[in-house]
Amino acid sequence: YLIAHSRDVCLTRKKDLYFPKRFCEGLAMISHQNAAIIDTISAIPRQTILDCETPLIQLHALSSHLDIDLWMKRDDVAGPSFGGNKARQLEYYFGAACDKQADTILITGAIQSNFVRLAAACAVRFGMKAIVQLEERVAKSDPTYQQSGNVLLNHLLGADILYYPEGEDENGADDTLYAEAEKLRAQGRTPYVIPLSESKPPLGALGYIRGAAEITSQTTDPFDYVITGSGSGATHLGLAAGMKIYCPSARVIGSCVRRPKAAQASRLRHLTGSFNTLIGCPDFLSEDDIHLWDDALA
């Protein structure tokens, strides 16, 4: 079988069409429902962050060792400031922020979050101030962990840094950002919050519908499986929807990175409803489309 894998997301492939580059031909070859979904997504504000398609490469040595045809989608090189797969998600969050004429973005994540660091870099690109909230998710971390890596880059990118002590309290972390946003509004600023908790629609998941279209445009044979990390759930849901549109024979499997399979399944069930509403098709993704694996969770 065929598998494609990236640092944060693993994917599988099948041939179909990529929008917007092949938008017209794609509409001619997919169902009316799928075409309506693409039409809905195309009307949602988006800011370009990826300058080009990311590579899809075959892993010859691993393929031979495992006796499979294994590929990797290199979304680790997507976007500015050392890249990362969250660039696809941020295209839609910054699309919404620019549409609202925001001058400040607020985001929360782990202390060494790539998502947070990439958001800070994108804020510079779009002329916005970044306020990043770093959550204490690692017990007894040393000063190097607290100050180096992405934390240092956040400082260099000019972000204001806040700290939140409860690393697994997503609703509380979001509430703190919304309270900070209200303070900014009182000062005449226009903030935009990029939320983390499952209580908000996963807007960033739309980026991986486009990502699935890109994958299928780069290959001539269909993949059987797509394997992705499943944490917040946005990348996982976007790929599940995108492959259902462009490569319905492929099974998307989420490898749990933060919580056991049962807890992650509950989270994704909750997010699926708001995601389906977002794409204008209330019954598009169902529990049958969500597959999880947690054997490597530690």
Give the label of every model feature segment.
Residues 25-298:
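PLP-dependent amino-acid enzyme catalytic core
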